[in-house]
């Protein structure tokens, strides 16, 4: 592993452990040349994914871009970073296990929205507003109406 500080290839793993859900290995490393310490993460990649953009352009799937967009929708929400990582890992696992190497950006957006809807309503609305390109207040009202309908359909816990 190349040192991010001095670009030396002479690094050493000092500590290695799985994350809570065991889907990622976290490694603490030290550069022998400059003594810089850094962390790397190792995860399984089932297949190389290609995203087909709305304009037809093909780009390699970028997990970090997915993480950033989920984090933006969850900004200032009471969701732990570990939960975000679990959510992103679940989305990537779903994409990789679909059997398709080429996936449309629309499909990815719908999968992200499904996962966010289960996690946090506010994050879901935020993501939907960008993904679906909301232009008017009625666009928000429609999504909020969907969420309200789901809330009414869910059984409520009655306390005595």
From Swiss-Prot:
Q: Where are the zinc fingers (unnamed)?
A: 3-34
One GO BP: negative regulation of DNA-templated transcription
Q: Which NCBIfam families match?
A: transcriptional regulator NrdR
Protein's name according to its UniProt entry: Transcriptional repressor NrdR
User: Which part of the chain is the ATP-cone domain?
Assistant: 49-139
Function recorded in the entry: Negatively regulates transcription of bacterial ribonucleotide reductase nrd genes and operons by binding to NrdR-boxes.
Q: Which cofactor does it need?
A: Zn(2+)
Recorded GO molecular functions are: ATP binding; DNA binding; zinc ion binding
**What's this protein's family per the entry?**
Belongs to the NrdR family.
What is the cofactor note?
Binds 1 zinc ion.
Compositionally biased spans, kind Polar residues: 1-11
Residue ranges of region Disordered? 1-20
Q: Which PANTHER family match?
A: TRANSCRIPTIONAL REPRESSOR NRDR
Keywords of the record, alphabetical order, are: ATP-binding, DNA-binding, Metal-binding, Nucleotide-binding, Repressor, Transcription, Transcription regulation, Zinc, Zinc-finger
